[in-house]
């Protein structure tokens, strides 16, 4: 089965072709970072308009890369939610228009299910079951994954997502957009232990997260720097130490909760997905913990940590392979800006 995947939930337009026999044939991605940078965040209307401009050229690109003709495609998968309503509507409209013109069925995909399954795109994918740590700008969750569509929420953030905390911390420190990669980069130059921040809910006894207090702690430190009238090199060094303290605190919590989830479920495999999953400090800490405690940890390729069409094409192929009745051939569709991943459980 050959599936075309279309991702447009936020500020990346991604298209890809996935074949159940040959794997990922081609994927192309356009990021809107440069367009949104001057606003310090994603502007939904601009995001939607850019998806309209970019989708068809990206389609031509993946078709040419893979030597695929429209007659070769068996189905079209698109991100149905969650995400920005206008952005989702663009991708859904394009998917269903192509499907109508080409006489193909469609299937709507949960954006987070795409992330959750993205590590299956590697050469040696992890077998089911496993624990999944989903860490992105909008979500932080621990899930027990028994099979495709068989998900149990073990824990989730009670306020800010981890990626949101990274972005807000970067803004407080005075870094550019997008903040997550910038604060991570700055943290690598900071001194470990120079600034020690709280580890929210580290000993809560459950698998939930909270990052709003960590963000507040960063703000408090910045006010201390201001009161001390730090400037120049001293201020830059203090900011680097603060970034290091923030990243260390966030990573400690993510690792500790992941270990607790593995212990609770008695599973030996952890899958990490979502944009924050590209963070080098997090990967290093989880890999070290895996080596020490004897479990396997799996990540998607770095290029597939961000939103992309490949994960949507894969999820579509897996769903249609298991549940052919999910194919939609009447081209009526809805989008779901808010959509609980656990609601997909079968």
Swiss-Prot record:
Cofactor note, please? Binds 1 Fe(2+) ion per subunit.
| Species | Burkholderia lata (strain ATCC 17760 / DSM 23089 / LMG 22485 / NCIMB 9086 / R18194 / 383)
The lineage's top-level taxon is Bacteria
> Where is it predominantly found?
cytoplasm
* Pfam families attached to this UniProt entry: TsaD
**Record's protein name:** tRNA N6-adenosine threonylcarbamoyltransferase
NCBIfam families on file: gcp_kae1 (TIGR00329), T6A_TsaD_YgjD (TIGR03723)
TM ranges:
none
> Which reaction(s) does the protein catalyse, per the Swiss-Prot or TrEMBL entry?
L-threonylcarbamoyladenylate + adenosine(37) in tRNA = N(6)-L-threonylcarbamoyladenosine(37) in tRNA + AMP + H(+)
Q: Where is it located?
A: Cytoplasm
> Is tRNA processing included in the keywords of this UniProt record?
yes
Query: What function is annotated for this protein?
Result: Required for the formation of a threonylcarbamoyl group on adenosine at position 37 (t(6)A37) in tRNAs that read codons beginning with adenine. Is involved in the transfer of the threonylcarbamoyl moiety of threonylcarbamoyl-AMP (TC-AMP) to the N6 group of A37, together with TsaE and TsaB. TsaD likely plays a direct catalytic role in this reaction.
List keywords of the entry alphabetically. Acyltransferase, Cytoplasm, Iron, Metal-binding, Transferase, tRNA processing
> Which of this chain's residues are annotated to bind Fe cation?
111, 115, 307
């Amino acid at each position: 089965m050959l599936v075309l995947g279309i991702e447009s939930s936020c500020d990346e337009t991604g298209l890809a072709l996935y074949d159940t026999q040959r794997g990922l044939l081609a994927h192309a991605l356009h990021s809107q970072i440069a367009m949104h940078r001057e606003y310090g965040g994603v502007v939904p209307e601009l995001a939607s308009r850019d998806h309209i401009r970019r989708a068809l050229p990206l389609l031509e690109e993946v078709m040419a890369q893979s030597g695929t003709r429209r007659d070769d495609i068996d189905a079209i998968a698109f991100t149905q939610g969650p995400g920005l309503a206008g952005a989702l509507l663009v991708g859904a409209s394009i998917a269903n228009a192509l499907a109508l013109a080409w006489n193909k069925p469609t299937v709507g995909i949960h954006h987070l299910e795409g992330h959750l399954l993205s590590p299956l795109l590697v050469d040696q994918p992890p077998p089911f079951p496993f624990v999944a740590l989903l860490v992105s700008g909008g979500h932080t969750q621990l899930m027990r994954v028994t099979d495709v569509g068989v998900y149990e929420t073990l824990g989730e953030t009670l306020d800010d997502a981890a990626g949101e905390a990274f972005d807000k911390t970067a803004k407080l420190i005075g870094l550019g957009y997008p903040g997550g990669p910038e604060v991570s980069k700055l943290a690598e130059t900071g001194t470990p232990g120079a600034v020690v921040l709280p580890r929210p809910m580290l000993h809560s006894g459950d698998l939930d997260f909270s990052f709003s207090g960590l963000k507040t702690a960063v703000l408090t430190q910045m006010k201390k720097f201001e009161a001390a009238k730090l400037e120049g090199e001293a201020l830059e060094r203090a900011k680097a130490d603060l970034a290091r303290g923030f990243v260390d605190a966030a990573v400690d919590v993510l690792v500790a909760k992941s270990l607790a989830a593995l212990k609770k479920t008695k599973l030996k495999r952890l899958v990490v997905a979502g944009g924050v999953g590209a963070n080098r400090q997090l990967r290093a800490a989880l890999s070290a913990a895996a080596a020490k405690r004897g479990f396997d940890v799996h990540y998607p390729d770095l290029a597939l940590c961000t939103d992309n069409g490949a994960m949507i094409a894969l999820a579509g192929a897996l769903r249609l392979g298991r549940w052919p009745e999910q194919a939609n051939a009447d081209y009526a569709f809805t989008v779901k800006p808010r959509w609980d991943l656990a609601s997909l459980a079968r």
